[in-house]
Design a protein with these regions (language model features):
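Catalytic centers of hydrolytic enzymes
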Residues: 1-218
Length: 218
């Protein structure tokens, strides 16, 4: 959703939803044997527009051992009911985002979806924006107080094996001793996975040299 616009509810099928979700999951790079970190596709990471969408009301796993377009698994409604290609879906998003999805070249190009509800029509052009509806909810329903909590709606899978090496790399990243690879211009981070297959680093300096060489590829 975009912060400044409205929320429109559209009717689609489970097949449409999964196509949309697969497109979003393409934001991640595929996992290769020896990878100990997940990473992002450089073209998507550096795009002018946000293309990393997440989904509420459902639970799912993104299996990064599979190629882009075939990664969404275990797709269910929040109540545990499985979602199939023919399952009726009501999905809420900003109309600007829907336009991006259905335009020429978009993942849902050529498809049209009936509008079931539009917050601008219901509440007005100003009061029907996501921003003002959120303000109204927080002030009128939550009395100005909101405590966030993890929703645990989705998960990544694919990093298997190399547990010892992964733990070492994780600790080095979290301590700030090393960083994940970034693009050559330094603007975009985590554009490649750290891979330890057939690599033995005698010290942190050797690891730093490897990471520097990896960044030069981007």
């Amino acid at each position: 959703m975009q912060a400044g616009g409205e929320i429109t509810v559209y009717k689609m099928t489970g097949k449409d939803l999964k196509a949309y979700m697969e497109w979003s999951a393409g934001y991640f790079n595929s996992v290769k044997e020896g990878d100990v970190t997940y990473s992002f596709n450089l073209d998507r990471r550096s795009s002018k527009y946000s293309t990393n969408d997440f989904f509420a009301g459902v639970t799912y796993t993104i299996d990064l051992t599979k190629p882009a377009g075939s990664r969404i698994t275990d797709l269910h409604f929040a109540d545990g009911k499985p979602i199939t290609d023919t399952t009726p879906i009501r999905i809420g998003m900003n109309s600007y985002r829907m336009g991006h999805l259905t335009k020429v070249g978009g993942v849902l190009e050529g498809r049209s979806f009936p509008v079931l509800f539009d917050t601008e029509e219901e509440f007005g052009e100003d009061e029907g924006t996501i921003r003002n509806l959120t303000i109204r909810y927080l002030s009128e329903v939550k009395n100005g107080k909101y405590e966030g909590k993890p929703m645990n709606r989705w998960a990544l899978s694919g990093l298997e094996g190399y547990e010892k090496e992964r733990e070492i790399i994780k600790n080095l990243i979290n301590s700030g001793e090393i960083s994940v690879p970034k693009s050559s211009d330094g603007r975009y981070t985590n554009v490649a996975s750290i891979n330890v297959k057939d690599k033995m680093f005698q010290n942190e300096e050797e690891l730093a040299v490897y990471l520097s060489q990896l960044e030069k590829e981007f």
